[in-house]
């Protein structure tokens, strides 16, 4: 063996030994990230996630899947995803301070007559998280991509374009969307 071969082998051995430390450091950083943001995940993505402000919706839609990927949520049993069998979808909260915030709220079950609900036949209601709603594109064919989920996904854009509609053709399109997505009501002008 000549000097160059010995030097090359020494460099390879040093690099091979340095790599596990880097992996350990990344795992430690990942663990710290998971611990640090667990409360945020439970607040915005977990079973008890409340309504999400529209300003945060985009960030939450990216955060929830990233946290689940890096922190092995569901596999390790940290947080179980909600039951997707229920058709009820809670859309994002409208911006506060808006004069029209209460005019485009989803129709709630409380508005239905009391005799329709019975304790024996009432379906179990579950909210879809922002991360799940973000995946419900119009082309989605997954089991959780119900019409209600797709409506909740497209509602912010529809609300922006339809209030007020820019033309008669757009008004007709908006009317068709609101008739399909009955959980939302259009702003009345």
Swiss-Prot record:
GO cellular component annotations of the record: apical part of cell; apical plasma membrane; extracellular space
Tissues where this protein is expressed: Expressed in coelomocytes (at protein level).
Location of this chain's protein in the cell: Apical cell membrane
Membrane topology: Peripheral membrane protein
Keywords noted in UniProt: Cell membrane, Developmental protein, Membrane, Notch signaling pathway, Signal
GO BP: cell fate specification; Notch signaling pathway; positive regulation of Notch signaling pathway; regulation of gene expression; response to osmotic stress; vulval development
Gene deletion effect: RNAi-mediated knockdown causes moderately abnormal vulval development. RNAi-mediated knockdown causes defects in octanol response.
Entry keyword Magnesium: no
InterPro entries (alphabetical): Notch_signaling_modulators
Molecular function (Gene Ontology), one example: Notch binding
The keyword Nucleotide-binding belongs to this UniProt entry's keyword annotation: no
Signal peptide: 1-18
Subunit note: May interact with lin-12/Notch receptor.
Function according to Swiss-Prot or TrEMBL: Probable secreted lin-12/Notch ligand or co-ligand involved in the mediation of Notch signaling. Involved in the lin-12/Notch pathway signaling of cell fate in vulval precursor cells (VPCs), acting redundantly with dsl-1 and lag-2. Required for normal octanol avoidance response, acting via both lin-12/Notch and glp-1/Notch signaling pathways in neurons, in concert with lag-2. Involved in regulation of sleep-like quiescence during the larval to adult transition, acting via Notch receptor activation and in parallel with EGF signaling.
Name of the protein this chain belongs to: Notch ligand osm-11
């Amino acid at each position: 063996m000549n000097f160059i071969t010995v030097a090359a082998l020494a460099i390879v051995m040093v690099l091979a030994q340095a790599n596990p430390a880097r992996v350990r450091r990344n795992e430690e950083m990942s663990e710290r990230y998971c611990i640090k943001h667990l409360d945020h995940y439970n607040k915005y993505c977990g079973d008890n996630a409340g309504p999400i402000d529209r300003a945060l919706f985009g960030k939450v839609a990216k955060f929830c899947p990233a946290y689940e990927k890096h922190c092995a949520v569901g596999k390790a049993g940290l947080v179980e995803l909600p039951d997707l069998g229920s058709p009820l979808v809670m859309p994002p909260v409208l911006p506060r301070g808006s004069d029209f915030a209460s005019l485009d709220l989803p129709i709630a079950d409380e508005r239905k007559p009391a005799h329709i609900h019975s304790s024996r036949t009432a379906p179990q209601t579950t909210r879809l998280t922002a991360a799940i709603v973000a995946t419900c594109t119009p082309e989605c064919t997954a089991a959780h991509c119900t019409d209600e989920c797709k409506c909740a996904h497209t509602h912010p854009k529809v609300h922006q374009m339809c209030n007020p509609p820019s033309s008669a053709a757009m008004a007709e399109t908006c009317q068709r969307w609101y008739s399909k997505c009955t959980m939302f009501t259009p702003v009345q002008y």
